[in-house]
């Protein structure tokens, strides 16, 4: 009998959500049943990421990153990285799991060696404003950092060189993402704009070059997240306007608008759409929003397939991994 049976890590689909109620919840994606709840003491959770080997999940919060075991029902974090001031807003992993990267409101992006017994960070990249988002280029050699001054930094990990661009002065960059083919980079900001660049270079010693492709006036309110689909054909943007919009990357036209706006005239806003993640086949998308719910949608029709209900406060981040390791 498999000792992992019944644990989150043994499920081919990992769906986790977290936010302001100090819990991380794990769900059966197809049924909407919550299978496990972990108490994340004394802190909201700003970002979640599953390790490449699907053995652990990282939860970034106030002054720490905590790693929870997916292959047991241990309620306590198995590793705790701390010693950072302020909120950690972003967390992710190198594709072979050797190191973790984070960004935070202390204006620093950090690299943490996961193989080291010493739980200190190995490298720091300092910028001049609080960091909202960090994303690792698919080449695994450049970190893209977005900050509250409106700057996007490209930190070359091989040479320690960096470049920056400012698509809109003094407008906070809230999310950056590169599609799996490394053809496009997208960034969204607090004015609701989505900027898209074509990517060239980024191989060998070449730093990635960004060629402006388009600017989409995606939302009339603050845009919070952008994500490309695994097949690179779609781009999703989430916003404070209660919508997640799906754009075709062939021409960046709007394909579907997923809305949590109420049809009742008397009902006020259900809150912000904070985060999203596509399924591996790019047919479905999960969203997290401040009405305490996560939802599974059909990308093509915009139909809600499942609601994940249980959080007591806003759901601001999620991790969705339905790729089965070979």
Curated annotation (Swiss-Prot):
The lineage of its organism: Eukaryota, Metazoa, Chordata, Craniata, Vertebrata. WD repeats lie at residues 1-37, 40-80, 83-122, 126-165, 168-207, 218-257, 268-309. It comes from the Eukaryota. GO terms for biological process: TORC2 signaling. Its main location: membrane. Keywords: Cytoplasm, Lysosome, Membrane, Repeat, WD repeat. Gene3D superfamilies: YVTN repeat-like/Quinoprotein amine dehydrogenase. Belongs to the WD repeat LST8 family. SMART domains: WD40. This is Target of rapamycin complex subunit lst8. It comes from Xenopus tropicalis. Subunit of both mTORC1 and mTORC2, which regulates cell growth and survival in response to nutrient and hormonal signals. mTORC1 is activated in response to growth factors or amino acids. In response to nutrients, mTORC1 is recruited to the lysosome membrane and promotes protein, lipid and nucleotide synthesis by phosphorylating several substrates, such as ribosomal protein S6 kinase (RPS6KB1 and RPS6KB2) and EIF4EBP1 (4E-BP1).
């Amino acid at each position: 009998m498999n000792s992992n049976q019944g644990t989150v890590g043994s499920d081919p689909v990992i769906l986790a959500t977290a936010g302001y109620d100090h819990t991380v919840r794990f769900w059966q994606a197809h049924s909407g049943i919550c299978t496990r709840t972990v108490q994340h003491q004394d802190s909201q959770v700003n970002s979640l990421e599953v390790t490449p080997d699907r053995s652990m999940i990282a939860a970034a919060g106030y002054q720490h990153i905590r790693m929870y075991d997916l292959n047991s029902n241990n309620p306590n974090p198995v590793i705790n990285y701390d010693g950072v001031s302020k909120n950690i807003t972003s967390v992710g992993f190198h594709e072979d799991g050797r190191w973790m990267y984070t960004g935070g409101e202390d204006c620093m992006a950090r690299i943490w060696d996961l193989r080291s017994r010493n739980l200190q960070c190995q490298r720091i990249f300092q910028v001049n404003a609080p960091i909202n988002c960090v994303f690792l280029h698919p080449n695994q050699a450049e970190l893209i950092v977005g900050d509250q001054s409106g700057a996007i930094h490209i930190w070359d990990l091989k040479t320690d060189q960096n470049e920056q661009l400012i698509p809109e002065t003094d407008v906070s960059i809230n999310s950056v993402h590169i599609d799996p083919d490394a053809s496009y980079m997208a960034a969204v900001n607090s004015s609701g704009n989505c900027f898209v660049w074509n990517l060239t270079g980024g191989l060998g010693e070449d730093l990635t070059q960004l060629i402006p492709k388009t600017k989409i006036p995606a939302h009339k309110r603050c845009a919070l997240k952008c994500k490309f689909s695994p097949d690179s054909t779609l781009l999703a943007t989430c916003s404070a306007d209660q919508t997640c919009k799906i754009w075709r990357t062939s021409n960046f036209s709007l394909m579907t608008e997923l809305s949590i706006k109420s049809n009742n005239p008397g009902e006020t806003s259900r809150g912000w759409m904070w985060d999203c993640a596509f399924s591996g086949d790019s047919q479905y998308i999960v969203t997290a929003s401040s009405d305490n719910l996560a939802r599974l949608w059909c990308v093509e029709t915009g139909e809600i397939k499942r609601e994940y209900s249980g959080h007591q406060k806003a759901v601001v981040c999620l991790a969705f991994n339905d790729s089965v390791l070979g």
